[in-house]
Amino acid sequence: MGLLSEFKAFAVKGNVVDMAVGIIIGAAFGKIVSSFVGDVIMPPIGLLIGGVDFSDLAITLKAEGDVPAVVLAYRKFIQTVLNFVIVAFAIFMGVKAINRLKREEAVAPSEPPVPSAEETLLTEIRDLLKAQQNKS
């Protein structure tokens, strides 16, 4: 098996394709969460805290001579922590739902397989032979 055919077999496996789709959706979901936190969650929190504008939260260290001032923008850190919490919670809820579905599938009793016509015929023959042996 050549290198190219091995790569093709690897690339089209279901797990690799599923993983790629998951990464793409995850990246898009991350952008949605970032916008949600920055544009929807942070402004009301700032209002509740007392009119704090989170976009301006930073600590500026003094400049020394020709060296410009260093800005520690902790607003971005707070927003990133909130992004992480929201994404982690969404993943937790998704995993919890999947686990519940797996448990329901495991609990549901499976019906016994329907015997084939050949099995049914053999069972009838066996029963007839037993009945003949019991008569003699």
Curated annotation (Swiss-Prot):
Molecular function terms, GO-annotated: mechanosensitive monoatomic ion channel activity
Gene name of this polypeptide: mscL
Species this chain originates from: Pseudomonas fluorescens
Keywords assigned by UniProt, alphabetized: Cell inner membrane, Cell membrane, Ion channel, Ion transport, Membrane, Transmembrane, Transmembrane helix, Transport
Subunit (UniProt): Homopentamer.
PANTHER family hit by this protein: LARGE-CONDUCTANCE MECHANOSENSITIVE CHANNEL (PTHR30266:SF2), MECHANOSENSITIVE CHANNEL MSCL (PTHR30266)
Segments in the Extracellular topological domain: 46-73
HAMAP family per the UniProt record, alphabetical: MscL
InterPro entries reported for this sequence: Mechanosensitive_channel_CS, MS_channel, MSC/AndL, MscL_channel
Domain of life: Bacteria
Topology versus the membrane: Multi-pass membrane protein
Cellular localization per UniProt: Cell inner membrane
A Pfam family reported for this protein in Swiss-Prot or TrEMBL: MscL
Spans traversing the lipid bilayer: 17-45, 74-93
SUPFAM superfamilies assigned: Gated mechanosensitive channel
Family stated for the protein in its record: Belongs to the MscL family.
Segments on the Cytoplasmic side according to the record's topology features: 1-16, 94-136
General function of this protein: Channel that opens in response to stretch forces in the membrane lipid bilayer. Forms a nonselective ion channel with a conductance of about 4 nanosiemens. May participate in the regulation of osmotic pressure changes within the cell.
Signal peptide start and end residues: none
Statement: the UniProt record of this protein carries the keyword 4Fe-4S: no
GO cellular component: plasma membrane
Predominant subcellular localization, coarse grouping: membrane
UniProt name for this protein: Large-conductance mechanosensitive channel
